[in-house]
Amino acid sequence: MQVWPGSSYPLGATYDGMGTNFSLFSEVAQKVELCLFDDSGRETKIDLPEVDGFVWHGYLPNVGPGQRYGYRVHGPYDPGTGLRCNSRKLLLDPYAKAIDGKVDWHPSLFAYDFDSQDRPNDDDSAPFLPKAVVVNPYFNWGTDRAPGRPYNETVIYEAHVKGLTFLNKDIPLEMRGTYAGLSHPSMIEHFQKLGVTAVELMPVHQFVHDHGLRERGLRNYWGYNTIGFFAPDAAYASSGTAGQQVQEFKGMVRDLHEAGIEVILDVVYNHTAEGNHLGPTLSMRGIDNQAYYRLVEGQAEYYMDYTGTGNTLNVRHPHTLQLIMDSLRYWVTEMHVDGFRFDLASTLAREFYDVDRLSAFFDLVQQDPTVSQVKLIAEPWDVGPGGYQVGNFPPQWTEWNGKYRDTVRDFWRGEPATLGEFAGRITGSPDLYEHSSRRPVASINFVTAHDGFTLRDLVSYNEKHNEANGEGNRDGESHNRSWNCGVEGETEDLEILELRSQQRRNFIATLFLSQGVPMLLHGDEAGRTQQGNNNCYCQDNDITWMDWANLDEDLIRFTSQVSQLRHDHPVFRRRRFFNGRPVRRGAGEPLSDITWFTPDGREMTEEDWESGFGKSVAMFLNGDGIPDRNQRGERITDDSFVMIFNAHDGSIDFTLPASEYGSKWEVVLDTATPQLAEPAPAAAQTVLTVEARSLAVLQRVA
């Protein structure tokens, strides 16, 4: 077979219409073989003829899309010094843009001899490893444009491609559980009904089903076990796995964009599926273990583990950083995605041992003209020391606000001494973000996410019920800040069911009407349950799949209406923090942009906030006090609102503010009823009864 020198850049397999350039980085390689596989699995080995700056490369004319390939890296095998080359192991290209097949767990996948890890395993792993695929980069995007939705107009919907669509009978059978199914008209209609402007997809990079799960008859459902940072997982494709998955993913993005919906990817750049020192050799470990992974200093056979998965990517190494940045740029420029949610993002900031917001990774993102312009969302923690970094990411980043989740849960389950922090969380968490010149939209607000209870389970279970995971119910978070409303799990008690429904409305209304960016877990709007399992990482079955035949239509309708209320009124989605403080203003001064009231109509004092037993408060939002301006520089104004929160177990009479705040009000939302309230008039200083554990919203009409 004819081989030309080719080029060291770009890395990976790049088809140009006449042939394909192959390039692979390895500082430790002594020789690199490109291995081509035909449809029968027959292997043809070709030495890459050139090496330039530790990048091995060659060009093969007439090799095109659909060609399956892998690499064999010849080099030193000395685990004690962190060297793990073994040419008997076929290796996936870290830059593979498509991957065909699944890991077939076999002893040959492990580079070491099971009797002595210092000896290499000489069995050939090629028959048991998936193959990289050369892809056709050309796609008809038509008039596709990124929606470019501002954060303060964004509503995020966290979704699992398969779990959301697999049981939806409005989607053709062959498309359920796939990229094509996610952008089916029935799904787009559902998103639009909820006011969703961005879907945040749980991991769609090619991932591996863990060996331990396979032995227990389970599968990796969530997908946080990546092996290909450029390849959309082929299991979510209805059209094929020899490159068709790339085209299908692009089609999904194009269709969602046409509907005005952005696509955000949950990405896992902190570790790979190769695990710890006892794990398999699938890709980077056999290519250049020292460059790609953080090794224990002085004990290089072992891996630093800040992720709880066995290894940590070495973001201190320039080629590992390049891999991550190249992957991010590829997904933006070639796949047209609109942003990323970075799993365990604190790990990416660990240049040495501590989390450093000035790390090279953040510097590279900041100066990159492509990546810096999309939505960047951090999961601001990892499992290492000092890993909890909520509020500490650089200014252009937003963060999953775990403190919002915890505080809102505590408030609505009636925990004492939460009122002051609750007020801060629903106003954008200024204590976390204002000091670094960030805006309220730095806070991605959520009550539930994939990791933990669904909203229905949050109000139905006090304890986790993870027995189906096969770990003796030891896995998963034990401190859930949940309340079952009186009975653990499912019940036919109508009073308890009504209270649970009301609590769900409380959470949804609080989420959508808080300052910041709301994120809704898929199915929470429809009553999805996981039967009390709060760690469904391995449940690819009806425990996690959304049951479209039994939707809570009332809750869907309520969610849609509250989302519309947020959309229609910029006072609920300000771009700047409030200036008002919970103290009385002076005579003759204009109304503050926000004012807090006790149930008897007094402005809250410091003593009121410090009371450990307060569970109710009224909040005045001044529609004339919005400091934001529109694109033409015109001042934004809105109606004023009063929001009344009552987390007590009994009803409370609230006195509405004096006439200077508004002479006439209408109740537009009351979570004590399943439907959005019919406008009910109320004059200034009217006494309004707010039911136990409910939220009421009043709009000023005069």
PLM-predicted stretches and their roles:
Residues 1-157, 162, 179, 491, ...:
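Carbohydrate-interacting/catalytic domains
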Residues 28, 50-52, 62-64, 75, ...:
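Short, flexible loop/turn elements at secondary-structure junctions
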Residues 155-157, 199, 263-265, 340, ...:
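Hydrophobic faces of well-ordered beta-strands that scaffold small-molecule active sites
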Residues 160-336, 344-367, 387, 432:
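Substrate-binding/active-site clefts of carbohydrate-active enzymes
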Residues 73-140, 211-225, 279-306, 419, ...:
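Core domains of carbohydrate- and sulfate-ester-processing enzymes
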Residues 24, 71, 159, 201, ...:
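Conserved, mostly hydrophobic/aromatic
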Residues 357-522, 527, 535-539, 570-577, ...:
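Conserved alpha/beta catalytic core and glycan-binding cleft of carbohydrate-active enzymes
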Residues 78-82, 165-167, 207-211, 271-274, ...:
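Short catalytic/ligand-binding loop motif for oxyanion handling, primarily in non-cytosolic enzymes
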